[in-house]
Amino acid sequence: MKPMHIAMALLSAAMFFVLAGVFMGVQLELDGTKLVVDTASDVRWQWVFIGTAVVFFFQLLRPAFQKGLKSVSGPKFILPAIDGSTVKQKLFLVALLVLAVAWPFMVSRGTVDIATLTMIYIILGLGLNVVVGLSGLLVLGYGGFYAIGAYTFALLNHYYGLGFWTCLPIAGLMAAAAGFLLGFPVLRLRGDYLAIVTLGFGEIVRILLLNNTEITGGPNGISQIPKPTLFGLEFSRTAREGGWDTFSNFFGLKYDPSDRVIFLYLVALLLVVLSLFVINRLLRMPLGRAWEALREDEIACRSLGLSPRRIKLTAFTISAAFAGFAGTLFAARQGFVSPESFTFAESAFVLAIVVLGGMGSQFAVILAAILLVVSRELMRDFNEYSMLMLGGLMVLMMIWRPQGLLPMTRPQLKLKNGAAKGEQA
């Protein structure tokens, strides 16, 4: 152990102790008209000391960690991709699908509800992966399309009484239209400028929903959004006025409130499977190759006779449609929508799913969505520090595997050693 490593560990621990002591060790209290600085509870100081110790030992043992991670990180370490190209992978995917269908009947109602939320984020991640991972366009306002889909279902049901299955394609079309219209002003923008424009779009949508109280309800939102039905059969104790019948009464079963949660999960699973099927089919079409060409080099893409303008428009439109479908499912799960559900934090969370999983890989998006959504739900008890913990996890992930958990495998052509030597000679 070199003295320099010990000194760096002590310095890092001291800096952490000072910063954590300021943000967590003290608290402001209102005494009449004055703010009084007071020390925090002993529990918070315990966490400060624990964090200081963790930082010290991490910095002290960091060289050993780096040596150990070299074998399992970096571009040379590529986890096997699962794209269904072989018979074994197809059998594995079928087994996963069967397990996913049977799983909700063996767990609790709350677990199934969390799984449904995970499915929603998987659809969002797959949609954003089209424009960010496959096309190489940075979008920070994806929550705007998400909100359009959710409010389309909520408004059509509130004012016209339309159901889930009727509103699902309409919400997708509305979000796709918004993506198509957004594509025109951002066609010539790239990089940070494109990200800023899309960020502004997401905030504009949220503010419009917040201020238009006569139609959207403003901050109060829209409530009493119905759940999806099975060919008109409702998963409730009694059918609504004008409804056909309930699921339990039609089949002569005992009413179980878990049936509604399980059915919503199966609907979400169906939408995930359809999303994967559509995206994989698009990737095998010339459109998918055009997305990859745009991501690699826009100038080379134009020189090949491809139109970057049309490619961007298709990417924005298709990506927004998936967000609209996810928004409809979110509104059905919650039974209530409000503008506060579609802040920039939601867009950042979906972007984190795509980046941490591995841009361009569908299976990576699924894995990252499961890890991040479940981690966020488990950290509900640390509500004040959940985003801090999530940010720390992202930083560690970027240090360990900046290319993501399962980066997309790209075809490569390499010359053999003999051929390369012959050309050099």
From Swiss-Prot:
Chief localization: membrane
Q: What does this protein do?
A: Part of the binding-protein-dependent transport system for branched-chain amino acids. Probably responsible for the translocation of the substrates across the membrane.
Question: What's the protein name?
Answer: High-affinity branched-chain amino acid transport system permease protein LivM
Name the CDD domains on file: TM_PBP1_LivM_like
Q: Which family does it belong to?
A: Belongs to the binding-protein-dependent transport system permease family. LivHM subfamily.
Q: Alphabetically list the UniProt keywords.
A: Amino-acid transport, Cell inner membrane, Cell membrane, Membrane, Transmembrane, Transmembrane helix, Transport
Task: Name where it's found.
Answer: Cell inner membrane
UniProt cross-references to InterPro entries, sorted A to Z: ABC_transp_permease (IPR001851), LivHM_N (IPR021807), LivM-like (IPR043428)
Q: What molecular function terms (GO) are annotated for this protein?
A: branched-chain amino acid transmembrane transporter activity; L-isoleucine transmembrane transporter activity; L-leucine transmembrane transporter activity; L-phenylalanine transmembrane transporter activity; L-valine transmembrane transporter activity
Top-rank taxon, per record: Bacteria
Alphabetically, which GO biological process terms does the record hold?
branched-chain amino acid transport; isoleucine transmembrane transport; L-valine transmembrane transport; phenylalanine transport
Report the leader peptide range. Answer: none
List each coiled-coil range. Answer: none
Q: Which GO terms describe its cellular component?
A: ATP-binding cassette (ABC) transporter complex, substrate-binding subunit-containing; membrane; plasma membrane
**Membrane-spanning ranges:** 6-26, 45-65, 92-112, 120-140, 145-165, 167-187, 191-211, 260-280, 311-331, 353-373, 387-407
Topology in membrane: Multi-pass membrane protein
Pfam families for this protein: BPD_transp_2, DUF3382
